Amino acid sequence: MPQSLPFSPAWLAFEEAVRGASHRGDHLRIIEGGGLSVDLTAQAYSPQLEAAGLALCEQQGFALARRQLFEGGEANWTEHRPAWHTALRAALPPPSVAKDILNERERLRRFVDEADARGAYKYVLHLGIGGSDWGPRLVARALRHQGLKREVRFASNVDSHAVADAMHQLDPHETLVIVASKSFTTTEPLANAEVAIHWLQNAGVADPIKQVVAITANVDAALDFGISPQHVFRFWDWVGGRYSLWSAIGLPIALAMGNNTFDELLAGAAAMDEHFLRAPLAANAPVQMALAGLANRSVMGFNSLAIAPYDSRLAHLVPWAQQLEMESLGKVATRDGSPAGVPTGPVVWGMTGTDCQHTFFQWLHQDTTGAPVDFIVCEHADHTYDHHHRLLIANCLAQRAALLRGKSFEDALAETCARVDDPSEARILAEHLVHPGRRPSTLIVLPRMTAHNLGALLALYEHKVFTQGVLWGINPFDQWGVEFGKALARGIIGELDKPSGMASADPSTRYWVDLLSRRS
């Protein structure tokens, strides 16, 4: 049974080891897993810290929790169900769910093959939100250099400007609309589906609903919506929204790039699953990333994690990771209801390189706190501008080295004295050139941007987050804060439609509901 962290023996030893560890990056630590290289050299390290991290995993019951994750145990204990997304990408799914998974995979494959054979649909309009949007959106952007069979557009926000932009210049007669919602009650995809169906109707499409596909765990609701059974693809309650890319939610990927590309994505994630399951914990990339994250957040007090993919194709990785990490770890209650007792999930933010260098890296280098950074880069590019790719890699490595190395006052003073005659002015200027250094970072290297490597990268982050949830003692598979906000929104929309005073609301909410209901 996991222990409350703050005063547990393994946590106290881990905390002491972090404070006593080297932060100079003088011990080369590179882990190979799932086809990726994960370089943790610039994270805190000592043999004592490595041992303390393994002891913490043992104390918190990590081995049992990992086994339950892969065997369909109650990993999501507050909702009393598994979190079995790993089964979706296994070549041979667990026997109890294999028939359902393989049948749905085959239905998906057949739908895509038949559409290809008929030359059906030039465009796909994917309507989801959160996990049903960010995963396929990320993959579609990251792999489009491989060529597209169909153009895919995404709309998620309930702001109808977004869906109007997505539909702009599409041919309604050649567009397949995908409505992706686990519950098939979520406001955003259903509201956008109504807009899309009206768009099809207004264009003279004879039977608009025939061009609509549903992906959901609530098949009955999709059928009630009017979608034909042949166009309803299923996933299950034990698949969390932010882990649903590996299910039928991946349909737009298969339609855009082919079934084989989606298969390779699953295979890459499965390869990282195997690494996570089999590799010793000291050489286990997700586990060691998780322990580094605990050291940074819960001991050294870093409030955030920056993600800097030095590849423009990974532009959507940051919001995908924001949802994965912050929706999974943005909580404090442990299994018995007591608080974790230490800082938990960090704020996740970032941008692709080299744009990020001209946006927020100044803060990373010289702010009083800074933040750990995950650098991500591909060894090989998929263009012919070799010099440009070398520039990209050089910038990535240089920024990481600068964050680690820093610049002392003495070095800065030697630099300023060489170009400023006045010693007093040289000393003042030198203060501005000091970089604290010893800022932690991780470097993740993909050999090339392929579906396999991308699948492995996403699974790496999934398993890191799972491990941190186990070590902090929190459930990474629920999202009660999201549900609370949704419930309040339902009450407010009722008031905007038919005001009654909202006596229980705060004064500001009452003011704006009253004002906007009268003006609308």
Swiss-Prot record:
* Active site location: E327 (proton donor), H358, K486
The entry's localization annotation reads:
Cytoplasm
Q: Which UniProt keywords apply?
A: Cytoplasm, Gluconeogenesis, Glycolysis, Isomerase
State any GO BP term from the record: glucose 6-phosphate metabolic process
Domain of life assignment:
Bacteria
> Where is this chain primarily localised?
cytoplasm
Q: What Enzyme Commission number does this protein have? A: 5.3.1.9
Any Pfam family the entry gives:
PGI
Pathway field of the UniProt record reads: Carbohydrate biosynthesis; gluconeogenesis; Carbohydrate degradation; glycolysis; D-glyceraldehyde 3-phosphate and glycerone phosphate from D-glucose: step 2/4
Which GO MF terms are attached to this record?
carbohydrate derivative binding; glucose-6-phosphate isomerase activity; monosaccharide binding
Q: Which cysteines are joined by disulfide bonds?
A: none
Q: Can you supply one Gene Ontology CC term for this chain's record?
A: cytosol
- What catalytic activity does the UniProt entry give for this protein? alpha-D-glucose 6-phosphate = beta-D-fructose 6-phosphate
Q: Which family does it belong to?
A: Belongs to the GPI family.
- Sorted alphabetically, which HAMAP family does this protein's record hold? G6P_isomerase (MF_00473)
What's this chain's function? Answer: Catalyzes the reversible isomerization of glucose-6-phosphate to fructose-6-phosphate.
- The entry's protein name is Glucose-6-phosphate isomerase
Tell me what organism the protein belongs to: Bordetella avium (strain 197N)
